[in-house]
């Protein structure tokens, strides 16, 4: 007989309120899980020497009431010094639970193992849910994956960003595989992850498949596609969206320049290159590019010839100036990819592709929900102009 069961029998024997018993048990369990989540996030237990000089630490807590079907529980939400910890147990600003299975699914999606969930459920409810049972409950999240891939998208997107990032995945052996990601912004400035494809390496077949899926989900026209210049991708884009203009990421170009010139020249070259994408208009940008190439070609002939032969360097100047800063590079989608990597550090690796997809869709849905409440910088000032670019 577990301690939980013993306490429950004593409660019943004393004819006390059974809801109060479950409320206090749930309160204890939830607070314990919050502390366990912070330990997992930091990577060490309280007072562990591993945490010394780790770059982050515990930083007290704040109180929150949380409404459950058993009554109000008092939670002590732990904080980290860097302010990056967000407990999976509670949605942002959430103050009410919906259902046990929803909590199980949420924990599973965010990386808590089935065994850890099983342990906490046993403490909360007094009977054992095996990891296999938890896993079966969590498979409901697979429906979210299908819904994500099949949902209807807007007909027109002003900007489409394409970029890949790598995450560890087990297929017999563990290796990092490429997540091909498409992120779009509507003329009104609504930003969202539109879709993704998983493959062992970045490849044009996967990009083609992803763009085909986006068309099937309703995207008819795209004004501008921003990429890092993956070989062959420009042709794939032209086949899918022949009217779309294309922009090469100028930050990638800048990094490439830095890697091919002498260290003594690097700072000057990079500073001069910035004048090309910070010009007041297209005419001045073209002149800045010509001056840049003319100055450095005698010393770096092959590098400058490669730059001369690179297409789609200044396409972004054809769009309203209010959004130039957002569309001359893939920085926007790269920021998303960095956040994905940060979030998945806790997970280490994914046991199969289905687990990876469940996790990605959770992250993407959360991202899309947050972005749905915002208008991306600059788009609100030129929405009518951007809309007029479509047929």
Curated annotation (Swiss-Prot):
Listed GO MF terms? DNA binding; transposase activity
- Database matches in Pfam families: Transposase_mut
The UniProt keyword set, sorted, is:
DNA recombination, DNA-binding, Transposable element, Transposition
Can you supply a Gene Ontology BP term from the record? DNA transposition
Q: Does the keyword Cell division apply?
A: no
Database matches in PROSITE patterns: TRANSPOSASE_MUTATOR (PS01007)
The superkingdom of the source organism is Bacteria
Q: What this chain does, per the record?
A: Required for the transposition of the insertion element.
- Tell me its family: Belongs to the transposase mutator family.
Name the chain's protein.
Transposase for insertion sequence element IS905
Q: Which gene encodes it?
A: tra905
